[in-house]
């Protein structure tokens, strides 16, 4: 979702009355001679194209590499631009008669308006202050995502001389982004808004993992291990020299700079508390995040109560499954390779079972792969990366095989149905492959919708008999339903109700999570 890729900043002195006049003038770009339907389509297309121009990294994931040497602007000034663009789009949208649109067009109209309004919601004073003060964390940050833009098995192309030149240019853009991140963290320190120490320590570990990666698995030197056969020897030599110089002379110094800043300057001042409301403006920011994730006007207390009731409901079903399972346990796999084979088997089983339920399936292939070494320690048990509609990149179900020898790792039917088929892969790729949709509906991400579909996809396991075995059913209950319900309780407890980390851990252990 675009306000996750680049959340907005602005001059907060702008009054509400300033919303319409300059925006209407700036947005007078939709031809009045067009029908309302045509004007809506044009407005949404122009808005999306402008957003991709401002945020080239968002374009990469759609297969648009026209500005592949850039990562976009991460400074506070960029957020002012995003706010102005949202104001402009809302003003232009107001000139289109919603009543004159078809039912499907009204959905597009409402979704577009909602998207722009959420962008503006990010500019509320306390919300914006927090967004600017906390530019990255261990889940959302350039230090975690950048390797995927730097290796041939990631998002970017490495087929032409220009692709290698763009990669070198991106390393320079990374260095500039590090400077912007540090400047924003410094502002947060001045305002008393910091990340928790544990989060900072994880970010330092991420950087250490990348800086210490052996040559054979180092993502930044990976392009040199797969130089195109079409390159002449001279081109290969130039590509090697340029990349080594960029990595050793620009990228690694920037990574070390960020690592040193986090360890020596930021960590000593990072907070020992973990809740959002422990920081200035945290109440407003957390309320914004609840609305962002749910699309509903819920309070933290309401979410907390919902979580408590769901935990009680699920625990009843869980207890029954435990009794039926007896001493049986899911098989454990001690190597990444054996775990991958087990995930393949789960995928084959689910794919065969869901066939009768769906008249069609995405054209884009779904592959199953372990996380790359640079991120397997820090990411979720599994996740999904969309493919490209033209078939040049499949959708990918990623799983964690980190430290498999010491951990009890088992594949899960429920998790495959959530992240893969018929979950995120179906929902995302059906939209991406439908070129009749506006790009916002093809590529936009709304958590309540995307995760809502994935939860529904999981539930089909009961209808299909995939959870008839109490071992599989207990996995679905404990690893899926119960963990989500527990997180509703724990998240709101920590961020709004003053829970300590110890309280959260105890509650999770009491409700099916291993310590």
Please state what every model-predicted region is.
Residues 1-24:
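Gram-negative bacterial Sec-dependent N-terminal signal peptides
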Residues 26-515:
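N-terminal maturation segment of proteins
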């Amino acid at each position: 979702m675009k306000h996750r890729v680049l959340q907005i900043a602005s001059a907060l002195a702008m009054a509400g009355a300033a919303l319409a006049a300059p925006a209407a003038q700036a947005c007078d770009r939709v031809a009045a001679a067009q029908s309302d339907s045509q004007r809506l389509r044009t407005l949404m297309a122009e808005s999306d194209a402008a957003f991709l121009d401002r945020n080239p990294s968002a374009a990469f994931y759609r297969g648009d590499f026209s500005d592949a040497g850039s990562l976009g602007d991460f400074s506070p000034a960029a957020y002012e631009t995003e706010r102005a663009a949202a104001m402009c789009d809302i003003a232009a949208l107001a000139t289109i008669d919603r009543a004159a649109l078809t039912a499907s067009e009204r959905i597009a109209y409402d979704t577009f308006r909602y998207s722009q309004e959420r962008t503006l919601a990010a500019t509320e004073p306390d919300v914006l202050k927090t967004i600017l003060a906390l530019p990255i964390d261990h889940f959302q940050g350039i230090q975690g995502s950048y390797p995927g833009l730097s290796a041939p098995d990631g998002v970017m192309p490495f087929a032409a001389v220009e692709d290698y030149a763009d990669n070198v240019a991106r390393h320079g853009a990374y260095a500039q982004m590090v400077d912007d991140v540090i400047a924003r963290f410094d502002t947060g320190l001045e305002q008393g808004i910091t990340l928790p120490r544990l989060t900072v320590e994880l970010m330092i570990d991420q950087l250490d993992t990348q800086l210490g990666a052996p040559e054979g698995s180092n993502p930044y030197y990976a392009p040199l291990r797969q130089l195109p056969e079409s390159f002449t020897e001279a081109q290969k030599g130039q590509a090697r020299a340029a990349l080594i110089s960029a990595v050793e002379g620009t990228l690694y110094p920037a990574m070390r700079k960020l690592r040193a800043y986090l360890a020596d300057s930021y960590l000593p001042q990072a907070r020992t508390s973990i809740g959002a409301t422990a920081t200035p403006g945290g109440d407003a920011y957390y309320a914004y995040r609840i609305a962002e994730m749910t699309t509903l006007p819920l309070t933290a207390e309401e979410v907390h109560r919902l979580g408590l009731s769901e935990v009680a409901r699920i625990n009843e079903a869980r207890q029954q499954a435990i009794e039926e399972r007896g001493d049986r346990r899911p098989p454990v796999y001690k190597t990444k390779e054996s775990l991958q084979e087990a995930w393949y088997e789960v995928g084959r089983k689910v794919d065969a079972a869901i066939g009768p339920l769906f008249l069609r399936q995405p054209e884009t292939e779904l592959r199953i792969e372990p996380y790359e070494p640079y991120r397997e320690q820090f990411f979720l048990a599994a996740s999904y990366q969309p493919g490209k509609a033209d078939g040049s990149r499949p959708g990918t179900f990623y799983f964690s095989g980190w430290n498999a020898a010491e951990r009890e790792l088992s594949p899960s039917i429920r998790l495959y149905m959530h992240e893969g088929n018929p979950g995120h892969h179906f929902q995302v790729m059906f939209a991406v492959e439908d070129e009749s949709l506006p790009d916002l509906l093809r590529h936009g991400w709304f958590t309540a919708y995307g995760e809502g579909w994935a939860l529904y996809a999981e539930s089909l396991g009961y209808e299909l008999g995939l959870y008839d075995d109490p071992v599989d059913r207990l996995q679905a209950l404990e690893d899926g339903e119960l963990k989500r319900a527990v997180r509703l309780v724990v998240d709101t407890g920590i961020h709004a109700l003053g829970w300590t980390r110890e309280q959260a851990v105890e509650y999770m252990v009491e409700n099916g999570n291993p310590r």
